[in-house]
């Protein structure tokens, strides 16, 4: 008996040390005192352990020992989930010096432990130990890697979460990752021979999801037509000669398109293909003067920020106007940094005007990729994040989005209907989906996702509720609209799908509408089972954010800038 107990005690200590070894002891450049722990390490994404998937975990600011786990995936395919952490929903935003971190007061770890997985292998810090520069990926392989990685996370990396309620979440191409992974997890939970280690799987959230290729193309044609991107004459021509009098709301415009990778589509050169090309264009080359990820947001000038060029990756995300002189740069930098407290702000409110973009966060989205790339490619940061020498020996660099994966990726499923249908059919316990969309995104538009979910609901006999507004609690301003589909399957499990829009947000909802986004996700993960979620509720989110204390700093200008950024962030309504 004593020998058995000793063995159990040794095993517990071993497991705990396995999880705690990934604790980040000192995150370089952190300008505020974090009241939560962060972890960075690796999980095995295949059975023999040669595929190493990097993860970061930011524990909840509230009750990390009991709060649910929220798993986050960025899309691409080929984009790092650390982009989501440092550019959207995480607690750390990178200053334009690429060296320091200021606080995002609207981070999603307000009442959840958030796990970021860099998927698939080859993205970010994830790597193949046997094949340097391994950048081959496809939908089935990504799903298998994600399933194995999450299994390893619960069993080995952080076993304290094995019995915790958990949810999946992500955006963009995660609209394919998440339904496929959800399907695999449900199958695993139902498999008595090789069960998934955590059975407390309660929901999945997809933001601006790439879930139905043709549906998104057809809906973008309509969205663009009604957002002034075509003349009345050309639209009449399209209806007369392309849809030929058929209902344009249900017409398949995608038949006039072509693609080399089944992800990016252009007009096929036919008469109708040429007519719809201006409507389906998403400014992929960055030469059309608008941001495809947020139709109404601009970067007027990102050259004022002294960040290096990005390490590589993404198709043009943000375009900016012609650069300015070094004298102008210095002047504008001083106007940003030399607030020195609220007294000077009161003297000259004009210093608050942001001339770099049309947002109120100092154009963060215009330059954050460059700053984040610089930060995550520094040796001291990589050491703090427990990045192994084996990854460095492969001459890797961290990239926000790795184009070598994007260009080699094989899309196998151009619609996710089958996965939603499998999930809904096979669930044995209550489950909920949140399908949310910023309503001014052209890459994965809200209308295409709404039509897709309507079809899923019809296929599975779900009942439609009314479409109602939801409000941001801080000032009761309209935050968007929500509609719920619900019903029970053959196993008597209640399934709900909340179809929600976020007013004025684009592709990156957690950045574009920070306050409403964290209110939305907190209500989703904390709402009781079998209820219609009230996304306006303050029960799970306090909009009166209390900022963390600052760490001591020898640089008064850095602290001044940090304070000014806080002042701006706290005045965000949307």
UniProtKB/Swiss-Prot annotation:
Extent of the signal sequence: 1-19
InterPro entries: AB_hydrolase_fold, Peptidase_S10, Ser_caboxypep_his_AS, Ser_caboxypep_ser_AS
GO biological process: proteolysis
Entry annotated with the keyword Signal: yes
Keywords in alphabetical order: Carboxypeptidase, Glycoprotein, Hydrolase, Protease, Signal
Top-rank taxon: Eukaryota
GO molecular function: serine-type carboxypeptidase activity
EC number: 3.4.16.-
Glycosylation-annotated residues: 48, 163, 241, 408, 414, 426, 534
Active site (UniProt): 172, 441, 507
EC supergroup of this enzyme: hydrolase
Keyword Protease: yes
An example Gene Ontology CC term for this record: membrane raft
Family label: Belongs to the peptidase S10 family.
Protein name per the record: Serine carboxypeptidase ctsa-3.1
Organism per entry: Caenorhabditis elegans
This protein's encoding gene: ctsa-3.1
